[in-house]
């Protein structure tokens, strides 16, 4: 049985402009991602590993729409992630998750772990009784 492609990343690139620290110093272009391509199939989970500074977080941020790519395309269920209608965008936001390598950047230290889990369950429309059992 052939599985459906749910996300496709084609020739993705992301550049950042680094401004000079001194007056008159030229800006530099930092190539964080260059020509990244892959497909994620239905039922798969993607894990990205690599050395510090290799672009893992930048790629993740592009996939969850926190950074706009400089080039290439990201499609989710056959639709361009950056140009999809609001309804589809909300569904994609529920389905695509990112776990940051630093827990302080992904969890709110003012909230309990159970509150954070419950909040995610509400987003995914898991009922109150099921939520309480878990």
Annotated model-derived regions:
Residues 17-25, 68, 80-87, 111, ...:
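ABC-type ATPase nucleotide-binding domains, specifically the catalytic core motifs of the NBD
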Residues 98, 103-115:
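Conserved catalytic motifs of ABC-family nucleotide-binding domains
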Residues 64:
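Helix-to-loop junction immediately C-terminal to a conserved catalytic motif
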Residues 49-51:
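The feature captures the beta-strand-to-loop junction immediately N-terminal to the Walker
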């Amino acid at each position: 049985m052939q599985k459906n492609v749910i996300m496709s990343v084609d020739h993705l690139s992301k550049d950042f402009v680094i401004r000079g620290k001194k007056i008159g110093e030229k800006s530099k272009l930092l190539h964080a991602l260059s020509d990244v391509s892959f497909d994620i199939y239905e039922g798969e989970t993607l894990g990205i590993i690599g050395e510090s500074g290799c672009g893992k977080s930048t790629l993740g941020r592009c996939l969850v729409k926190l950074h706009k790519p400089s080039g290439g395309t990201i499609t989710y269920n056959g639709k361009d992630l950056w140009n999809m209608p609001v309804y589809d965008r909300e569904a994609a936001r529920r389905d695509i998750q990112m776990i940051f390598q630093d827990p302080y950047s992904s969890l709110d230290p003012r909230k309990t772990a159970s509150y954070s889990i419950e909040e995610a369950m509400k987003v995914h429309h898991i009922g109150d009784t099921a939520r309480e059992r878990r």
